[in-house]
Amino acid sequence: MNSQQIYETSHMISNENLDVRTITMGISLLDCIDSDSTVACQKIYDKITTKAKNLVKVGQQIEAEYGIPIANKRVTVTPISLIAAASQDHDYVKYAKTLDKAAKTLGIDFIGGYSALVQKGYQTGDRTLIASLPEALAETDFVCASVNVGSTRSGINMDAVAQMGEVVVAGSKLDMMTNAKLVIFCNAVEDNPFMAGGFHGVGEPDVVINVGVSGPGVIKTALEKVKGESMDVVAETIKKTAFKVTRMGQLVGTVGAERLGVQFGIVDLSLAPTAAAGDSVAEVLEEIGVAQVGTHGTTAALAMLNDAVKKGGIMACSHVGGLSGAFIPVSEDAGMIKAVNAGTLNISKLEAMTAVCSVGLDMIAIPGDTPKETISAMIADEAAIGMINNKTTAVRVIPAPGKKVGDTVEFGGLLGYAPVMAVNKVASTAMINRGGLIPAPIHSFKN
């Protein structure tokens, strides 16, 4: 970077909501496995609080020294279904409470990895963990969970899809916010620094630092300078801006990893919005020329945005990964909320948009009386998009008890608020009740 680019980056931070959304430490818990769950939980607590003891302090030091805001300090761990399977416990909530205790000790924002990978079937412990999700998430403050129900190589586990519909409904009855901390994936990635879907994959190093950047406001401001120019110019502008944003993320990641004495992993190139004014992916799409997000042309604009961000970011950092795309959560994006309230954006259009970006139907409030089979069918549709297109897709929907279409649900903090959106009233009950496995697509057979 030359001095002019450094000045521009500084201006982005001070005036355009640019920040590092998260610095996330991934920690393997494979060496914490024990047939005695009490011993295992103690090992888990000790390892997390030892390895990540300086994470918050180092993050704050980097903020102070470089003037770069770091919104969140987080930890991800090995999927707990793999760790807890060695025990004979019939309930894994104690593992979730151990993670929560560690998060509180460290002072971090979230801890992810109360997870199960069931894309091709259940292993010992998977059903137990999934059944415990409503209670585990309701009784903890900082724990995030995810379940991978499908992949391009394996197909879609429809038994798990059906079970997750039940879990989402059960969670909403205990505490609506449980579902804000639960993501159901197809093609989940092992190095995701973002929540609620982050976990530490078994192929990852023992301890690693991954970084997630932000930057919708920066992209929007850059595009305001090229009004009326061709799409070629728009794409080039996004690329150059994404380069600067990613450079900042790599700086934070490499410095943080060095000071913590661990390996640097990846920068996730995702554009992550917030509910704050000027920090919206929807507003970027509208700056490209879409009259309001959700109308015709939205999917094309989003596809170009997503691709240009990746092209610019990958030139700035030799190690990119995670989800790396444009997030389109409804509750966390002021422009999305406005479009839903105007009737321009609905769930069907959001589903189409997920085919060209990351990750999926995210932070969407739906009526509290939505049947579990309808939620399962939404999960199946998203998983199918991910499976066929060889990309990560996900569902994070929040049934709001007592709420109907048009009501507003407040989540608070970074999660913002959301209008309750309509779902199709005709349920695909017979399809969901079939269970079984949707086979992997023909183009997954590449060996």
UniProtKB/Swiss-Prot annotation:
Highest rank taxon of the organism? Bacteria
Fill in the subunit field for this protein: Homodimer.
Family statement: Belongs to the UPF0210 family.
Organism from which the protein derives: Limosilactobacillus reuteri (strain DSM 20016) (Lactobacillus reuteri)
A Pfam family (short name) is DUF711
User: What protein name applies here?
Assistant: UPF0210 protein Lreu_0940
Instruction: Identify the NCBIfam families for this entry.
Output: PRK05313.1 (NF003700)
Which segment of the chain is annotated as a signal peptide? none
